Structures are given as C-alpha cells and as structure tokens.
C-alpha cells in the first residue's frame, strides 16, 4: 500500500512537528525558517509525492527535506505503507522543455563539438559572475566611502573607524555589532567579499583600507548609476576640481605660446597696468601725507555702528509672564536622554550618528520621555519644549514594562506634558525570545493608538531609528520655520496639574492664530515632570486601586471617573442593600466601558474584599 499521490498535507504535519519540537531559546531563528517553509508548503499549488519534490517549494532546502524524509520513512514503517519511489516526471518534463526550446537544442549541438576530454568529465566550467554589491548594502557603502575619502592607488588609505563614519550614510545596516540584541553580524562582513574580489586592499597595522584600480572603476560606476553627489569638501571633489583647474591653466598657456606677438602684447599691457597702479599708489601716499594734524579722517558708518540686537517681546497674561519669539530668532535642537544607548559599549551612538547627518543634538537627563525637540533662542540661549516628544523601547524592554505596569505609568506621564505629538518608538530588536508575549504587545500597542492617541513608530534597529530621527528633525525644522513661539515663564509651577492647566489656557487664547504655538520653557517642564514621592490625594487614590492585582491604570482611571474620591467609593458600597449587590457593584457600573477598562465578576469581588468589606 502506498501513500496518497499528493502527500502535501502529510509533509505539512511533519513540518509542524519539527516546529513544535524546536522550543529552546537558541532555536528561535530555526523556528522562523520552518514556519516560513510551512507557509510556502501549504500554499504550493502542485502535488508533492516523493520527498525530493519538496525541493521545488520555496524555503525548503536539503536539510529540511532530509528531516521530512526520515519522518516519512518512520511513518511508512509504522503504518504499513511502502516508501514512495522517485518519479521520473521531473526529468521527462525537463527533457520535453529542452526539445521544444530551440535555444536549448542549439546549446546541445555546441556541446557535442567540444573536445572529448570535457565530455568524459561530464561537467562544463561555469563562467564566473562579476561581483557587484547590492544597492545600500555593506559592500556598496564601503566602496562609495573609500571613493569619497579618495582612498585609491593614487591616494592614501584610511582606518576602519574613518571609513565607517563616511560609509554609514550609504548603507541601510549598521557596521557595528550589538551582541545584546543578538546582532552578531554587521554590514562590515562585506569587506571579506570585497577583498576576495580584489576590489579593496587591506594593509598595515592597524589595518588601513584603499581601493584597487578595479574597485575605483566599480565605485565610480555605482556613484554615476545612482546619481550620488559627494560633499564639495570631500577629497574626491577637491581632487576633481584641482584636475579641472590644472587643465584650464594648461590650455591658457598653450594659447599664448601659439601666437608669439599676441603674448608680447599681453606682456606689455601687464607692464603698463602695473606701472599705472604704482603711480596711483604713490600719488595716494603723497596726498595722505599732506593731511594736517588737526584734520581727522572720516570713519565709515558701517564699521562704527554696532549691529542692533533683536528685541524679545515680553508680556504678562492673567499674572503669568511670557515671551514672543519670532520664527528666525531660534534654532531647533534634538535633546536626547543620556541614558539612551545602543549598547553598554556604545553609549554615544545616537549623538554621534545624528551629528554625522548634520543634526544638532544635546544630551542630559530628561525627567520624561527619551527624546524631545527644543527651541533655543539665538541671543539669550533660553530653551523651550516643543510639541514633539519620543519614548523609545526595545521589544524586550516593552514586554517587561507592560508586565510591571511601568508602560501605563509612562504613558500617563507623557500625556501630562501636554505635547500634541507623542511618539512611541519600538525597535524590533530584542535580547531574548518574546514570541510568547506577542498578543500582549499587540493589545498594548493598539490601546496606545486608540485610547491614548499616541503615534506608534516601528523601526528595525538603532540605525533605522537614527534615520527616522534625522527625517523628523528636518520636518520639524521646516514646520517651525514659519511659526512664532509664545514661551510661558510661569513662576509658581508646583505640580503637573498647574503645568498642564496653564499650557491649555495659553493655547486657548493665543493659538487661534495658526502661526503661533504656545510652550513652556524647558526648565519648567523638567521641574514639573520630575518623579517625586510626594503625591496628591488623587494620585494616592489611584495607587491604592492599582495595588489590587488585575487593576491597570486605565481601569483605575475608569473607577475614579465614577467615584472621584475614596470616600464616594466607600459610601457606594455602604448603600448596597445586600452583600451580593456590593460584590458586583463595580462590574455593573462599568459594564458599558471599553474592552480593556471593563471589570469582570471576580475582579469586582476582589475590590469589594479589599475596600468594601471594611
């Protein structure tokens, strides 16, 4: 007895068993490969009989095929099936295609004319394909970086650090490893292929790199094909300009030597001009010596008059002082929390990479958020917090923050800043397997978008984060190039509530003009948003509710909206006629709440046990 003619379903079951058995943490990538192969197998249109037919499926290689073949052999032995014989349909199909294709027939005739030695070997030498790196890959960036630095046979070599600093802008991947996120390989590994193909030379200690003649030609063609323009101050451009200048000098010299009489006339004109200029200089000197002692020379008004400073308009509204900054009176700066690092070994990664892209940054401790855009006045140096703030998370850090309720607390503090554009940036790199928390992350991200009105930005790694920050900085600079700022200088901000209330009050009054934006000065934001052990009664009430297992910040806020104080909650419990009514009080009150803010029966009972049974 033989297996069905289309054993695709059977092979899919075997492949699923392989996935289920690969559960350890170090097999995470294997599981991804097998899942991809399983998806391709289920969607493969043609029948599959013999294990070798699996090689036609995208994502299934020799190793996976061997595993499935062993499982099929065991299955056949246990169930009394005969192991399938390899069919010749593939060979027949291939020969039919060769016969019907005239180009293939021609190839066969050519091979018959080759010497008998090649026929006896049965193989034909394959022509070596010319190596050309993929666009925006590691090798692509290295070639263009060396070309821009002028590191070729006629120039000097450069170190790895110098090369990476320039090559990074031409590559989408990082040239640095990051073992903390399992990034054990980097784009720098492409240097091996470049050396193997004689495009790059490595020499000396420490290693220095330069282009070969073939590498220079390839790099130049890549530059031309992709319309890349190097910086004017680069070695490549300076060398190019120097060559053009020398060519123009050579051409001028050639023109003069062709016509000797013209050259003599040119020389006579130069002599006469120099003589006239000397005479004018002597006359001017003589005239200046005749100036009397009491006569003072006139001084240019442009030099003596100091440039007036631009005045800052100041005012007071409802007892709160403010300043008005014109659009051209301030610069935009990206401020990064100094605790935001790529890894322990590379703490200045973000500031360094952004500076290479021409983005001005500052770094210090932020009391809220990880990155914020500030406006800095050109004369006073005073700073104010703009309406754009970023909270950055890696996937593993996101999972931990959700589990320990830090995620909800951070969102609450970000909302208290009053920023209109709050970005939650998630880097899809992780130090361990987080696939078991996928549903939890999806739920948290969706609630953040829908209920908190945050922007979610997903990036592949730290390098794509830098690129996104660069793009955002340019957009924000363009946006604020036409905006005036009303900077609030509140003297008595004692808590976050006053900070947010005053900001909303100013926005209502001043932002009726779309060309004006209101914001607090940076010092006020830092002092108002600092974490403190001193809590208001409202915050203490929320903390008490959140001490009950299962009560998130969203649920606590929903309870507080129905029962504003702890006293009103206790009175509501005491008004219940029976104990059963008290146990389901919160459940019934919040039955119309959104999904993540509803209180179930058991949780309502727990709340009564904690607070209502007093």
Curated annotation (Swiss-Prot):
Biased composition (Basic residues): 123-132
A Pfam family assignment: ERCC4
Major localization class: nucleus
Cell compartment(s), UniProt: Nucleus
Comp. bias (Low complexity): 87-101
Protein's UniProt keywords contain tRNA processing: no
SUPFAM superfamilies with a match to the protein in the record: DNA polymerase beta, N-terminal domain-like, Restriction endonuclease-like
Any single Gene Ontology cellular-component annotation: Holliday junction resolvase complex
Cofactor: Mg(2+)
Keyword Metal-binding: yes
Region (Disordered): 80-132
CDD domains per record: WH_MUS81, XPF_nuclease_Mus81
Residues of the ERCC4 domain: 333-430
Keyword terms, alphabetized: DNA damage, DNA recombination, DNA repair, Endonuclease, Hydrolase, Magnesium, Meiosis, Metal-binding, Nuclease, Nucleus
Subunit structure: Interacts with EME1.
Function, in words: Interacts with EME1 to form a DNA structure-specific endonuclease with substrate preference for branched DNA structures with a 5'-end at the branch nick. Typical substrates include 3'-flap structures, D-loops, replication forks and nicked Holliday junctions. May be required in mitosis for the processing of stalled or collapsed replication fork intermediates. May be required in meiosis for the repair of meiosis-specific double strand breaks subsequent to single-end invasion (SEI).
Family indicated by similarity: Belongs to the XPF family.
Protein name in UniProt: Crossover junction endonuclease MUS81
Species whose genome carries this gene: Kluyveromyces lactis (strain ATCC 8585 / CBS 2359 / DSM 70799 / NBRC 1267 / NRRL Y-1140 / WM37) (Yeast)
